[in-house]
């Protein structure tokens, strides 16, 4: 372009107007191309600055071109669940919980991010979630904190839990005592697990019938909507491997749960190939704690970052809701027994009746009179004499 400009000047000085006229269009085209390139570069620089600005959830701590994960999570406050919710110095925690139940906040704080308290709204961001993390990553603590955050914000009249733990641990033992809990399988008893899955299927059908009978499209449009049901499954791969024939029932739950108020939280150590494509298509909320392989992290959140979380930060995780990925640190519950007691006290003060179990353990070989339930209304023909089992619940036969 510079050579063309010099030649044009020479032609003009020598008054060779014909040659100058021939050079002018070419010179003008080159100038326009240069201007276009400059504008494009400036536009790309502006977009780059916008994406990595202060309002972006992308981490801002870098060492060269790599995120300094240790510094990233070290800068996030590590506080207890009680302190996060202002309960650590509360002399009457149950009273605060009752107040929370009356407000019914949709969001639930479970930890701290770079910009403050990290909240999750399962109903709008989900309605289902997948949680992954290797041993020692803090997965159990995150599940407990998440469920406790739900329990202190929603009363047993509006929220129920079902817990299925297939690693034979004690993750949900304390949560079983919550007034919200309507079922818990905390061992490797497959017969008990089958009853739980049958009960979930029956509840799904019951809610479908309610919605159909009132000719509405969503459960919250019902005149008397049932409580939301959150089904938490730990070590999902064990359930899939041992009861593969029942996976279709959970696929239906994932497909229809949004409109019926039923939510699924699937937990595993390795997210690679653990969830059927039909179920995965309905899971839009992913939380990845530390994993051992970058492919596992990419599978869940679309980046390798979760595989680079230092082991010194249990509870550190990335949350991906389909649009953005946010790093956060989970706030672990310090005294779960005291908190569960406060929730039960709040339930008793509110006068709420604990929900009936959704399922029970299989019928024992022998039953005593203490296992029988007296009829609510005395009648000469209501004489309890045995226990009956319909494959889901055990009840007293009259």
Report the location of each language-model feature.
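P-loop NTPase catalytic phosphate-binding loop
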Residues: 1-49, 100-301, 307-310, 372-398
């Amino acid at each position: 372009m510079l050579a063309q400009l010099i030649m044009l000047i020479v032609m003009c000085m020598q008054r060779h107007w014909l040659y100058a006229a021939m050079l002018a269009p070419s010179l003008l085209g080159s100038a326009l191309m240069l201007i276009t390139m400059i504008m494009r570069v400036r536009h790309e620089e502006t977009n780059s600055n916008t994406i990595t600005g202060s309002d972006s959830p992308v981490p801002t701590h870098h060492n060269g071109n790599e995120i300094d994960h240790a510094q990233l999570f070290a800068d996030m406050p590590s506080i207890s669940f009680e302190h996060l919710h202002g309960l650590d110095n509360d002399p009457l925690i149950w009273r605060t919980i009752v107040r929370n139940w009356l407000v019914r906040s949709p969001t639930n704080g479970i930890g701290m991010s770079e910009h403050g308290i990290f909240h999750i709204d399962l109903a709008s961001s989900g309605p289902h979630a997948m949680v992954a993390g290797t041993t020692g990553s803090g997965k159990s603590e995150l599940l407990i904190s998440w469920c406790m955050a739900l329990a202190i914000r929603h009363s047993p009249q509006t929220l129920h839990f079902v817990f299925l733990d297939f690693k034979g641990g004690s993750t949900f033992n304390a949560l079983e005592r919550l007034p919200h809990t309507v079922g818990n399988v905390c061992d490797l008893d497959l017969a008990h697990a089958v009853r739980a899955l049958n009960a979930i299927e029956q509840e799904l059908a019951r809610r479908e019938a309610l919605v159909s009978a009132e000719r509405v499209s969503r459960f919250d449009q019902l005149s008397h909507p049932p409580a939301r049901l959150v089904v938490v499954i730990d070590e999902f791969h064990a359930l899939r491997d041992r009861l593969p024939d029942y996976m279709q029932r959970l696929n239906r739950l994932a497909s229809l749960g949004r409109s019926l108020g039923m939510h699924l939280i699937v937990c595993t150590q390795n997210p690679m190939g653990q969830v059927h494509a039909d179920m995965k298509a309905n899971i839009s909320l992913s939380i990845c704690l530390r994993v051992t392989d970058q492919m596992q992290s990419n599978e869940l959140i679309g980046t390798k970052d979760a595989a680079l979380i230092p082991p010194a930060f249990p509870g550190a995780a990335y949350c991906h809701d389909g649009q953005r990925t946010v790093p956060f640190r989970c706030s672990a519950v310090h005294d779960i027994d005291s908190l569960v007691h406060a929730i039960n006290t709040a339930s008793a003060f509110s006068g709420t009746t604990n929900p009936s179990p959704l399922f029970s353990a299989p019928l024992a070989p022998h039953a005593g009179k203490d296992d029988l339930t007296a009829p609510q209304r005395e009648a000469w023909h209501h004489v309890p004499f045995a226990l009956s089992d319909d494959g889901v619940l055990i009840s007293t036969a009259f």
